[in-house]
């Protein structure tokens, strides 16, 4: 006789929690929220309709109902809060959570939502029923709480060996699957007629990671609980996050990457996810194509809404209404794509930071290696063997080649090539040489440009006679000046002002044997006239007392003679009246050393530098 009153929210709630939905449909959820706010008894009727949907045996319906209740709690104010905290709704939640046939994910979702609502209703003591129900559920189902973190135990060699075996087994299975991929389409065609049950929970294919599972066979895991790091190096995540597995670090801890961050996480907080199949990848690609295909409709809707008059009734305009509903349907997919590509953006950002750091480290190492090259003899010309007329040292201008092989003496100054005025500076300003330049390397300090007037040398410098005053010899005197000058300096260490006895020994100086020194002393005791006369085979070299009265010749410094036949005529006169000898005797091939014997006059000894 009396019929039950029809609930106006049954259809709207059933539509928002349809079991055939692949995800939460926010269009239908917002419609329920708007309807609850528009009606006086909307909150009570909506909660009554949701209690009916919680009794449904499909896990998807139960999950969608919990999401609808959470959306109402966040958008509809105190009215819906009072109904959600009522005894009828909390008892329905406890019955569903304590049912042994309820899926584990649904139980976890109930506990999670009740915790959120307890915190949301904490300011109002009238809603204490929700807190009581939450504490009761925690007591009756302790396994729903986030587990305690396992200890960090080092991985043993046996664990490493087991991980390697699992990896090899996974590779073998992958190769076997690829080998049997050809008959696979026929099997799929034969089984396509069988109906497929799509009412299972979305996480039915996922399973918790067992303690002995290695990271070699798992690439992705999903978080079951929120995890807050308590030590440095741990990865923070929220429930539902998908973590990319990198490697095993401890016995029950893996290393993973999430939103650009890398760290370790406990295995009892996550569940293993299988790798996406070809069908799943195609489904994701189709979803992205649907979202991008609605871009034109969204732009068209914005254009119509911006150009229409404010007096236009939007509800009467069928075009605007159709565009609105078609674009609103892509909102859940759009939110999912935003989360997906946000995670990829974080991963690429982290990869870019690692690449930049690696590039900076490489460049710093490269600059450090280039800043310390191999040691080289900068400024020191390569010394040719004694007695061999080698090429000119590095840093000295190359003298002109001699055209006549029978010509013994150096050409006149006008025959030599003067260096250009803008020629680069040579190494060092006042260098002391361990041996004189060869015949093809004139001293640049004594070679002024052609045609330049004679310039008086500086007082602190030693006056250098022209090379025309040198007579070729085949004997090198023993030098007592042991310390060679450093390159690139402007101070000349005079052996006269600083005798060898007052200077520290040069570590690189060559010690002359005693027999050779005795031989040199015997040669120095010979008569003076014998040293002044040219040798029948090897002419002597040096100055004579009569050279001091001769007028100076041209100031150019021609190349020194090398090993050539004996002279056919007398050498040119000696220029200048300087009493200071040159520290650069000529070096020629052949024979042993023969020192110059000084004359018994008041003139200073030219060979004083070599004693």
Curated annotation (Swiss-Prot):
One example GO MF annotation: ubiquitin binding
One Gene Ontology cellular component annotation held by this UniProt entry: ESCRT-0 complex
Example GO BP: protein transport to vacuole involved in ubiquitin-dependent protein catabolic process via the multivesicular body sorting pathway
Keywords carried by this UniProt record: Endosome, Membrane, Protein transport, SH3 domain, Transport
Biased composition (Pro residues): 558-575
Membrane topology: Peripheral membrane protein
Highest taxon of the lineage: Eukaryota
Compositionally biased spans, kind Low complexity: 182-195, 388-397, 452-472, 509-534
SMART domains: SH3, VHS
Region annotation (Disordered) ranges: 140-163, 182-211, 373-611
Domain UIM: 162-181
Localization per record: Endosome membrane
Residues annotated as domain VHS: 16-145
Transmembrane segments: none
Biased composition (Basic and acidic residues): 151-163
Domain SH3: 216-275
Alphabetical list of Pfam families matching this protein: GAT (PF03127), SH3_1 (PF00018), VHS (PF00790)
Database matches in InterPro entries: ENTH_VHS, GAT_dom, SH3-like_dom_sf, SH3_domain, STAM, VHS_dom
Biased composition regions of type Polar residues, renumbered to the chain: 196-211, 480-492, 596-611
Family annotation (Gene3D superfamilies): 1.20.5.1940, 1.25.40.90, SH3 Domains
Its biological purpose: Component of the ESCRT-0 complex which is the sorting receptor for ubiquitinated cargo proteins at the multivesicular body (MVB).
Subunit structure as annotated in this protein's UniProt entry: Component of the ESCRT-0 complex composed of HSE1 and VPS27.
Family: Belongs to the STAM family.
Protein name (record): Class E vacuolar protein-sorting machinery protein hse1
Organism field: Aspergillus niger (strain ATCC MYA-4892 / CBS 513.88 / FGSC A1513)
